[in-house]
């Protein structure tokens, strides 16, 4: 999962210094569970003076409000703290361990349109259906859609109407798709 922009001030593992994706390990965090090399970002939450919250606190709020969960699993928390701190993450977890939330929660919390690359058309449809049921704004763009439907989705992409967009890997080389995302704010790209 890429958090969009790389931190200019990287400290931590040798892999990070060499430009490789760091692996999240339990020993890579401090006593509070914060990844050692993550940067905490402060975001304004609203205009009513609620103050400022860290981006991870914002992710916890999204988890509760949008997904109905009270807390993250330990592996999810470590990965999401890193993502919200603008760090790249490679999360290798078993089926059913909650990998999707690792990119879905930050996608909603960060705003803009996050792109999820998935080779599985059935997964795209399933995930979009679940997110729609939660009141979120996802979409998928693949060859199962008619040409007219693909054009409609591309136009809505250009307007920034989606929070999460699922695409197949080959879509990343499609000129019409690249044109549609050209001016988007893309805070996160995930490969699922």
Question: Predicted segment positions?
Answer:
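Short, low-complexity, charge-dense intrinsically disordered segments
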Residues: 3, 7, 11-18, 24-34
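Short, Lys/Arg-enriched N-terminal segments with co-localized hydrophobic residues
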Residues: 36-52
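Conserved pre-motif I regulatory segment
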Residues: 53-94
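Conserved nucleic-acid-binding Ia/Ib motif block in the N-terminal RecA-like helicase ATPase lobe
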Residues: 60, 115, 121-167
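Pre-Walker A (Motif I) flank of P-loop NTPase domains
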Residues: 85-91, 112-113, 161-163
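Walker A/P-loop
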Residues: 86-105, 117
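SF2 helicase catalytic motif II
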Residues: 163, 177-192
């Amino acid at each position: 999962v890429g958090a969009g922009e790389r931190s200019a001030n990287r400290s931590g593992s040798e892999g990070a210094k060499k430009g490789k994706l760091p692996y999240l390990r339990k020993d890579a965090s401090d006593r509070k569970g914060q990844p050692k090399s993550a940067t905490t970002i402060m975001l304004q939450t609203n205009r009513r003076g609620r103050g400022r919250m860290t981006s991870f606190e914002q992710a916890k709020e999204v988890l509760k409000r949008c997904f109905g969960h009270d807390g993250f699993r330990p592996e999810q928390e470590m990965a999401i703290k890193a993502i919200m701190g603008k760090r790249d993450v490679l999360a290798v977890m078993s089926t059913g361990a909650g990998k999707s939330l690792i990119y879905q929660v930050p996608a909603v919390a960060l705003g803009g349109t996050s792109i999820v690359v998935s080779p599985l058309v059935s997964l795209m449809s399933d995930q979009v259906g679940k997110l729609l049921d939660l009141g979120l704004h996802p979409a998928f763009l693949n060859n199962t859609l008619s040409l007219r439907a693909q054009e409609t989705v591309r136009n809505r992409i250009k307007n920034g109407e989606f929070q999460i967009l699922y695409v197949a890997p080959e879509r990343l080389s499609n000129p019409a798709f690249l044109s549609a995302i050209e001016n988007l704010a893309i805070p996160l790209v995930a490969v699922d």
